Amino acid sequence: IAELVQFANAHNSHVHVTVNMLPHESDLDGIEEYLKTLDSIGVHAIIVASPSIMMLAKKLGCKFEVHVSTQHSSTNSSAARFWKEKGMDRVVLARECQIKDIRSICEENILPIEVFIHGGMCISFSGRCVLSNHMTLRDANRGGCAQSCRWKYHLMDGETELSDPTNLFSMSSKDLQAVDYIEDFIHMGVASLKIEGRMKSAYYLATVVSSYRMLIDYIYEHGHADVEIIERVKKEIAKAENRPTGPGFYNGLPGYKVQLYQDHDETVTQEYVAIVQDYDKESQMATLQVKNHFMPNQDLEIFGPHIPSTIVHVVDVYDSDKNVLEVCNKPMQIVHTKWSGPIEIDAMIRKIR
């Protein structure tokens, strides 16, 4: 975490550490020392669900901000006012809030407000589910959720099976995707937009974060989001999604169309195959690290922090001994190829399905 804080400071970014478990008595030992350590290395904020940890951080005089976690299910301005009185610095609203409620809370201007815009949705109130506790003995409220709601079940009525044995019952919801609401959030004064990153790959995060960043920058430049940019961003995000998405609760109480009652395809439309490690402008040779199987002499798509998604035709690919490769299928292998399109260090390359 200390190394991450140094990196973030050098890139004008912040590090917020989740300390949002609901601690049982046996978990209390070491929390004070942990908070002091986080403070000493300069994290910018902690995200907390337990009032005991919130109060401890304030009592210790920690320099970082204390943000109320979404797991506290804050859904109204009275809750925000309560947390302000307790000295909290920001509230991450419950994912069960509707757009109209978020607007009303922001209009009160009580505390900076943070909302979720992308990622998994709990079938129960966020962070309040105990399915995982019962099914796997893993405590969902202490970082151990096994996502039991996404398992496939035989739905029984006594001895009679109601589910289709070839398409078993599930009880999870579609993931949240709030592209259509980003303009609203910006104009109503939401302080921070939150993307779920727990257990996600670097490729997923790079794709989703860069897509929303593109949309946010467009809105700040033009004052609004038109249909073209909305569809472009949705198309980009879909390249990393492996679950159906929907608006969550933002339109109101979700109906059956945002629930996933049966099996569904979880295949992404594009596959992350390499990352750029180096590039020689004079020879136009790119050095890549292989991540997944791909073939030379095909079209690939590159994207990075400073370059838009661009299709580039890749010709011959060589290993470190300058041998021509017929296939790139060794993860972490370093390969070289002539590159004719835009490129930058750490840009990601994906296969087009």
Pin down the residues of each PLM region:
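Alpha-helix capping/helix-boundary segments
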Residues: S52-I53
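Non-catalytic, usually N-terminal nucleic-acid engagement modules in DNA/RNA processing proteins
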Residues: I1
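Surface-exposed amphipathic alpha-helical tracts and adjacent flexible/coil segments at the periphery
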Residues: L4-M21, D29, L35-D39, E65, ...
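Conserved phosphotransfer cores of two-component systems
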Residues: G61
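Gly/Gly-Pro- and Ser/Thr-rich, intrinsically disordered tail segments characteristic of DNA damage-repair
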Residues: V66-S77
